[in-house]
């Protein structure tokens, strides 16, 4: 898991499990 940046469809500023 990691903190994704703004503009990412699989995150949008939140933590994703990709």
From Swiss-Prot:
Class in the EC hierarchy, top level: hydrolase
Cytoplasm recorded as keyword: no
EC number: 3.4.21.-
Activation/inhibition comment: Strongly inhibited by antipain, PMSF and aprotinin. Inhibited by benzamidine by 49%.
Protein origin, superkingdom: Eukaryota
pH sensitivity of activity: Optimum pH is 8.0.
Single annotated GO MF: serine-type peptidase activity
Keywords per UniProt: Hydrolase, Protease, Prothrombin activator, Serine protease
Keyword Kinase: no
Thermal response of activity: Optimum temperature is 55 degrees Celsius.
Any one GO biological process: proteolysis
Family as reported in the entry's similarity comment: Belongs to the peptidase S8 family.
Role played: Subtilisin-like serine protease. Cleaves prothrombin at 151-Ala-|-Met-152, 271-Arg-|-Thr-272 and 316-Tyr-|-Ile-317 to produce meizothrombin(desF1)-like molecules. Degrades fibrinogen. Inhibits plasma coagulation.
Subunit structure: Homodimer or multimer.
Protein name: Subtilisin-like serine protease AS-E2
Species in which this protein is naturally found: Acremonium sp
């Amino acid at each position: 898991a990691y903190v994704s940046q703004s503009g990412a469809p699989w995150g949008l500023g939140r933590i994703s499990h990709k």
